């Protein structure tokens, strides 16, 4: 992937200027020696937000979610506290650190290589993002990004701040534009549509979902129709029934892997206008409409448990669960053979009661925080998620080979999407 001209001396310099100016502003506002320090800033915010010394503290941490929640009600905060929280939010914009990573990783021809690691995700075998971490780029919503780019390349910090206000946010939106195609080419982006919903329905044999994807493809409307008994033709803009689409959407995205109300909340159900009281009903209705998918969770868990208990292979839904080992090296694995032939591995598995008092599969995994081997446990829904994402990954792998066979260059890909550095006359990838 190639960088735009002016990246190093424009974008890179602007990050340092932006950070320093915000830090100077915070020091001037608070009088603190290091306003980036949580130990210094939390007491300052608490003391300046109280009308009386006995009032409760405003906050006890400066996590992203905490700052965001406080700023949603900034009308109730003193002006200096609100201003400092906004500065903190801008200073904490981790996405602009990607510019530093870009500069570090840049190689010959202003290109960055090695952005994905093959089989980087241990459980599913998916590619993992490396270096610049392009798998979680911030979205851009500014309509005048080209003008913002010119200001940055000219190192015009004051102009950028005067026109756009939040400089770190503007810089983060420009990250995508720092990557450009090769000379005479353009980026062509293609993605799978609702790939995980398709795979789990196919694997479980949820026929009505398969029929939706084979015809109109409106899975959110169709799900709402199944859940609430409303004709799908009524769930269109302008009709009161259209409000049900949101419930169908959040349920489809959140509940496929045995999740409940907490999964709906994590998917943003409350922020999308749903109330906590109606969430259990949504869970129940979705499960009633998707009995085959629910059955898949339990079939997967039972097959895995049986393989562990009997040391005999167990098959269900096109999957084969087995306990495998290597006597020479003393290794043992619970394996899951996918329909395509690839296997998933759960190292050093054993059975033990989980926190709910149920017999569950435990295995060793590298902790995301500790980066050390530690014991983890799993269940039917979680294993189903691993299996579905692994099958979707294999679909992507086949597609990458098909694209390469057509003489096109994939310069990056995410779990369900490919970015191709294509000649200007390429417009679509039908049949790939």
Name each model-derived stretch.
Residues 24, 425-431:
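Short, conserved charged micro-motifs
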Residues 1-28:
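C-terminal segments
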Residues 247-257:
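Short, amphipathic alpha-helical "recognition" segments used to contact nucleic acids or chromatin
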Residues 193, 380-401:
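Conserved pre-motif C helix in the palm subdomain of viral-like polymerases
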